[in-house]
Amino acid sequence: MADNMTTTQIEVGPGATNATINFEAGILECYERFSWQRALDYPGQDRLHRLKRKLESRIKTHNKSEPENKRMSLEERKAIGVKMMKVLLFMDPSAGIEGFEPYCVKNPSTSKCPNYDWTDYPPTPGKYLDDIEEEPENVDHPIEVVLRDMNNKDARQKIKDEVNTQKEGKFRLTIKRDIRNVLSLRVLVNGTFLKHPNGDKSLSTLHRLNAYDQNGGLVAKLVATDDRTVEDEKDGHRILNSLFERFDEGHSKPIRAAETAVGVLSQFGQEHRLSPEEGDN
């Protein structure tokens, strides 16, 4: 299975979440206009309603992390999203949005290129994704948890017990899922813990998340460059969905991979990075 498997990589840069939300709001506006023409079939109407619900939820969460003067409503984002489409479809810089100038990527000499950081976000100098080492950085006294053939409730409790020994600061955690001596899941996490006055701990920064298949091949790598926090509200859920699908293809009890990952992420307060379907498992 590992021979034909490619590694999926994501690099998180500033502004990408905002731009994506605005773009999807523009798509929603197009869906709604199409619906007003009575040209949208029933599956299309269903997609329209689901997209609207997801966007409203995502905007609400994202706005909490934004300064008050940068918070925008769905309607405001729709207007920006439609302009973004004009830029993309017609390569028209006159319709340009601040921070969104794909025309400038091809024509950097043009005078209408004030800023296009998010479209061409530079990685850490000398640290392009393909150059970043596969293993997260080493830290003192890394935690390794091997979950042998046990039920998922016991597995989650063992993870919780091990994680609770972690002190404040950077950490590295390896989770292995061993069922009948078959290594079905391995997740390697690098991040930073904060310890609160009441004794609770939270994951303040997720620097890396590597996941491996049964044969030890790297399946997915989630990277936050320059120690930036992986942006809020489900930026990683698609990569995790893809990861679980690949595990599912090669294991007799695929749900264990998803359930174990739910348990791992829940210990760090990161359940929102899972899709609703995964969270229900």
Swiss-Prot record:
Query: What outcome is documented for mutating K64A in this protein?
Result: Complete loss of dsRNA-binding and 20% loss of inhibition of IFN-beta promoter
The source's domain of life comes to Viruses
Q: What is the effect of changing R53A?
A: Partial loss of dsRNA-binding and 15% loss of inhibition of IFN-beta promoter
Q: Name one GO cellular component term.
A: host cell cytoplasm
Explain what the record says happens when changing R33A: Partial loss of dsRNA-binding and no effect on inhibition of IFN-beta promoter
Ranges for the region named RNA-binding and homodimerization are: 1-93
> What name goes with this protein?
Non-structural protein 1
Which source organism does the UniProt entry give?
Answer: Influenza B virus (strain B/Lee/1940)
Q: What is the lineage of its organism?
A: Viruses, Riboviria, Orthornavirae, Negarnaviricota, Polyploviricotina
